[in-house]
Regions:
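Surface-exposed loop/linker segments characteristic of extracytoplasmic
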Residues: 1-225
Length: 225
């Protein structure tokens, strides 16, 4: 929901006031549907060729296309399911991360990244985001995919940067990598060749530069990248 809560700071207070962050959205209501289909350029990468509102089935909510966002927060280096223990990244459902919690240092921690929804050459979907909210966990219990919409599915260990697997990780149409927003506000370019591991046996530990940057408090040393 971070994209939604940011609206008042983007001169979009009237739109924010039309959408309650604490209530389900009635997408059968034509007025509500028109609001959540609003295209917000600030939430789109300039290089994006994504159809907007979303046309990819994986980016729709209950089959309904609504406005896209290319930007998602990092939830850490592990799997995130609705009933999982607290993730170790900055953003996750009901997160309340404060600056003091990021003990690895703001310049050493991923906050946000980008993701395209355009299929790659292999035909796999890049699962993108919507800005208006999230789908409820109750719709598919214990399934972390339920929070991919507009929240935190920049999940380390899934397809890596610009990978060719099913796209839950960072992706873009930029040559060679993606842009990332660090916790200190700096924007950097993360190469698709960054030191990373896609080994399921190491998914819960910070075993590479990529993993360590996604975690806010593991105490691991991070070199140049």
């Amino acid at each position: 929901l971070c994209n939604l809560f940011t609206l008042p700071f983007m001169d979009q207070a009237p739109l924010y006031n039309k959408i309650s962050p604490n209530s389900p959205m009635d997408l059968t209501n034509t007025t509500v549907l028109a609001d959540v289909r609003t295209v917000l350029p600030a939430y789109l990468c300039p290089s994006s060729a994504d159809p907007n509102p979303a046309q990819n089935a994986d980016n729709k909510v209950n089959g309904v296309a609504i406005g896209l966002s290319n930007y998602l927060g990092f939830n850490g280096n592990g799997d995130y399911r609705c009933n999982s223990s607290k993730p170790n990244g900055m953003f996750y459902m009901n997160s309340q991360t404060r600056i003091r919690d990021i003990t690895d240092g703001l310049s050493n921690t991923f906050a946000f990244t980008e993701r395209t929804t355009v299929n790659d050459a292999a035909g796999t979907n890049h699962i993108g985001s919507i800005w208006a909210g999230v789908t409820p966990c109750a719709s598919t219990p214990n399934n972390f995919e339920n929070i991919r919409y507009g929240l935190v599915q920049a999940r380390v260990g899934w397809s890596m940067i610009n990978g060719t697997g099913y796209q839950f990780g960072p992706s873009s149409l930029h040559e060679g990598g993606v842009h990332v927003l660090m916790a200190d506000g700096a924007v950097r370019f993360a190469s698709e060749n960054m030191d990373a591991s896609n080994n399921p046996s190491t998914i819960s530990s910070a075993t590479s530069t990529y993993f360590r940057l996604a975690v806010i408090n593991d105490g691991q040393v991070i070199g140049e990248w």
